[in-house]
């Protein structure tokens, strides 16, 4: 089950914002969360029961609207022999567009970015969105290890969930009090035992972490200098070494040590995605200032480079609030594309001066993402939470490209 891309998360956030703005006149907006292992027939049976129960609603209008929403859900359920891989969410209800009598039935049915865990039926004046909001919390997987010469604990952190994978003990003896040659020989044995223990830790970490495709980083912790000795030695696979974010001094090993590592690393963990975005925009800026740099910006130039397949990474600001429209002239057949914040329904035809009508209107981010996907270009939606993200929006119109080659 793959992790959602930045583009998919952006679209999910946009849908969530749209849903959060909806309000019903009464408690008549219906939300249904269906886990992937739930039988559709069970859900349909429950909907029939709710339809029967809704006959007890006192308000005639609310009763009618709730029953209409449930009937729409029952019809939509017939399209699914079983829930999708991550489950199914359904939001249905009469949403007013203005004063009384302007209500329209609105229906949203989609697979969420993460699996649904619990079946929910909810009817209120707002759609129930809390489970979806929780999906926007950070869910990347991080590798954690706390170690000293006596003990090591290996774990993963995903969102708020900690999984202890392995606890190891060394059997390395403590300091020997004898002096002279006996002391030196004993110290060598201690160092050899410690070396073998660090090798064992590395083997278990390699086995645990190399198989995690979406591993975002590794944090090492523990009392003393054993963690630095481990990191600087030849114990950890070279690909995992690259993912070590930081080392943290802790008072404990074991599970207490793991929790201490997390507590002391919250600032670092929260900055990981932000740093990735910052580095992408900084790379774009470096390319831009070079005479032969592989970068372009602005809608027209980036569109041209996308059409040529020359764009490696497309950078789009999440605050890019423009529409892309297609106008058609019924008289001469001329077609025209136009970008704007609020496109008019008609334009004057440049070919025959007759009136052109807006035949298609779409979000500009969706339009550019579609172009990028057709030519295999990676898309990154950049937030405005960093100085670099604001610079992309304000200085470059929110559209930048890192190129594969200079056309």
Curated annotation (Swiss-Prot):
Keywords: Cytoplasm, Protein biosynthesis. Pfam families: eRF1_1, eRF1_2, eRF1_3. Its main location: cytoplasm. It is found in: Cytoplasm. The keyword Protein biosynthesis applies. One of its GO terms (cellular component) is cytoplasm. One of its GO terms (molecular function) is translation release factor activity, codon specific. InterPro entries: eFR1_2_sf (IPR042226), eRF1_1_Pelota (IPR005140), eRF1_1_sf (IPR024049), eRF1_2 (IPR005141), eRF1_3 (IPR005142), Peptide_chain-rel_aRF1 (IPR020918), Peptide_chain-rel_eRF1/aRF1 (IPR004403), Ribosomal_eL30-like_sf (IPR029064). The keyword Protein biosynthesis applies. Belongs to the eukaryotic release factor 1 family. Directs the termination of nascent peptide synthesis (translation) in response to the termination codons UAA, UAG and UGA. Heterodimer of two subunits, one of which binds GTP. This is Peptide chain release factor subunit 1. The gene is prf1.
């Amino acid at each position: 089950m793959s992790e959602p891309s930045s583009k998919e998360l952006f679209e999910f956030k946009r849908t969530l914002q749209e849903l959060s703005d909806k309000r019903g006149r009464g408690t008549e907006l219906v939300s249904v969360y269906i886990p992937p292992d739930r039988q559709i027939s069970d859900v349909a049976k429950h909907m029939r029961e709710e339809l029967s129960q809704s006959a007890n609603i006192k308000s005639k209008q609310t009763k009618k609207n709730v029953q209409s929403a449930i009937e729409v859900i029952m019809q939509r359920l017939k399209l699914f022999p079983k829930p999708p891989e991550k489950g199914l969410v359904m939001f249905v209800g009469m949403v007013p567009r203005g004063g009384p009598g302007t209500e329209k039935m609105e229906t949203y049915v989609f697979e969420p970015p993460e699996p649904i865990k619990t079946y929910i039926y909810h009817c209120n004046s707002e759609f129930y969105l809390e489970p979806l909001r929780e999906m926007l919390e950070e869910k990347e997987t991080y590798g954690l290890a706390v170690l000293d010469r006596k003990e090591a604990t290996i774990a993963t952190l995903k969102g708020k969930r900690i999984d202890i994978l392995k606890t190891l003990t060394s059997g390395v003896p403590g300091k020997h009090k004898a002096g002279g040659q006996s002391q030196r020989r004993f110290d060598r044995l201690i160092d050899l035992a410690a070396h073998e223990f660090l090798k064992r830790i590395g083997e278990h970490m390699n086995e645990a972490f190399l198989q995690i495709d979406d591993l975002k980083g590794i944090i090492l912790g523990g009392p003393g200098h054993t963690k630095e000795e481990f990191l600087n030695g030849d114990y950890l696979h070279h690909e995992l070494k690259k993912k070590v974010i930081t080392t943290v001094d802790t008072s404990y090993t074991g599970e207490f040590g793991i929790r201490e590592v997390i507590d002391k690393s919250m600032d670092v963990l929260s900055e990981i995605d932000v740093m990735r975005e910052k580095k992408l925009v900084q790379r774009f800026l470096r390319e831009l200032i070079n005479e032969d740099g592989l970068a372009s910006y602005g809608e027209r130039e980036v569109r041209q480079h996308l059409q040529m397949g020359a764009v490696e990474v497309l950078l789009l600001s999440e605050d890019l609030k423009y529409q892309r429209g297609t106008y058609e002239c019924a008289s001469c057949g001329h077609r025209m594309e136009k970008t704007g914040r609020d496109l008019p329904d008609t334009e004057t035809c440049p070919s025959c001066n007759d009136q052109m009508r807006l035949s298609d209107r779409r979000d500009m981010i969706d339009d550019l993402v579609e172009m990028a996907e057709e030519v295999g270009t990676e898309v990154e939606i950049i937030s405005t939470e960093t100085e670099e993200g604001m610079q992309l929006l304000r200085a470059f119109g929110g559209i930048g490209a890192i190129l594969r080659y200079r056309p």
